[in-house]
């Protein structure tokens, strides 16, 4: 629900404020688990609609043409939000093809090999275009070590 924080507070930085509030409910050794879409996920470049607004390329373009307060973020933006909210450590995992229908989950310690990602990449929750072959692009992203940037979503384990 992090992406909806803009609806729950008038704070200038609603996502950080939301995470700060949640930290008060965590034990000192507790963990916060976040599942969220990556605004730069490959599926959005390939023709999937933004999951929350239903518009093509909405997150990629910075949500400029929407009244929605929903926002998704890149890995770097999420790291900053988490740090600014006062948390210490964030471990990123990469559910594939995304967190709603994961077939595999990767980590920074175990990133996929090309044959790990050779599956059908249908979108079950929305209509989409198929602008290119995602499996072929993933193969190139893996060679260039860019999988994390284009992962469709994140599962994040956050500690104080």
PLM segments and residue spans:
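A short SAM/SAH-binding and catalytic strip from SAM-dependent methyltransferases
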Residues: 1-13
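A short glycine-rich, Lys/Arg-flanked "PGG" loop and its adjoining helix->strand segment in the class I
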Residues: 10-33
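Conserved class I S-adenosyl-L-methionine
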Residues: 31-58
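Acidic, His- and aromatic-enriched active-site or binding-groove loops in soluble protein domains
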Residues: 55-67, 114-123
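Short alpha-helix
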Residues: 67-94
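Conserved catalytic loop of SAM-dependent methyltransferase domains
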Residues: 89-127
């Amino acid at each position: 629900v992090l992406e909806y924080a803009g609806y729950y507070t008038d704070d200038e930085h609603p996502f950080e404020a939301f995470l700060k509030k949640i930290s008060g409910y965590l034990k000192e050794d507790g963990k916060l688990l976040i599942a969220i879409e990556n605004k730069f996920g490959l599926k959005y470049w390939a023709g999937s609609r933004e999951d929350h607004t239903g518009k093509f390329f909405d997150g990629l373009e910075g949500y400029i043409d929407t009244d929605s307060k929903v926002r998704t973020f890149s890995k770097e933006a999420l790291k900053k939000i988490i740090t600014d909210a006062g948390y210490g450590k964030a471990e990123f995992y990469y559910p594939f093809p995304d967190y709603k229908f994961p077939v595999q989950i990767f980590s920074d310690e175990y990133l996929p090999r090309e044959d790990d990602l050779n599956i059908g990449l249908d979108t079950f929750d929305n209509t989409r275009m198929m602008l290119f072959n995602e499996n072929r692009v993933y193969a190139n992203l893996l060679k260039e070590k860019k999988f994390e940037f284009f992962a469709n979503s994140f599962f994040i384990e956050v500690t104080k």
